[in-house]
Amino acid sequence: MIALIISLCSGAIVYAVSVMYAGIGETFSERAGIMNLGVEGVMLMGAVSGYITAVHTQNLFLSFLVVLLTGAALGLVFAFLTVTLQSDQTVCGMAMLIFGTGLSGFIGKDVSGVAANLKFEKIAIPVLSKIPVLGDIFFKQNLLTYAMYFIIPLSMFYIYRTRYGLKLRALGENPAALDAAGENVFAMRYGYIIFGCMMMSISGACVSLANTNFWNSGMTAGKGWIAFALV
């Protein structure tokens, strides 16, 4: 019975981490004053780009780099549409969702069902993993999960306890005041949108390269919408 509970709790953390990466990305984007409804589409693009790279290169580092570049590219496009062209955020977000969902399914069809034999394996932390119950749940996870243990408090500290975080909040709440203070509102929004999409892309990689070891169209299964709703 205890083993079952430990397994369920450990699995819940794995599931939650993929949602958290997307949620943090959306948080920074919305704090910057830009709502991104295309979270799910960006996640799928991150998932498929990372998996395709893993299949063809068998290099996890290179796969992760491609995931980051995919997120950055999508973020740049979204920032251009919403910040430079000042297009409707809802329409652009839905367009990103449809684009990401469709393109990921198209480019991923050749690797659907193909095993990459490469993923972020679970790593037991010495000493901490020996703690009864908690060690099995929290300290026998993959690198992306361990990174999230630090990203959450660091993000909170950045947003609420630093000068840059104050500017970020002003960027969303009163951009005119920030502009009057001599800050480049456009450049800051570009940066945070790109960063947000990179986090969303990592979220997709969590699904295809950590939680599982395969690619299937639509495999994020609504996690992007859950992240958006939580934010």
Name each model-derived stretch.
Residues 138-214:
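Helix-loop-helix "hairpin" substructures at the membrane interface of multi-pass membrane proteins
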Residues 2-10, 61, 86, 134-145:
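Interfacial loop-to-helix junctions that mark the boundaries of transmembrane helices
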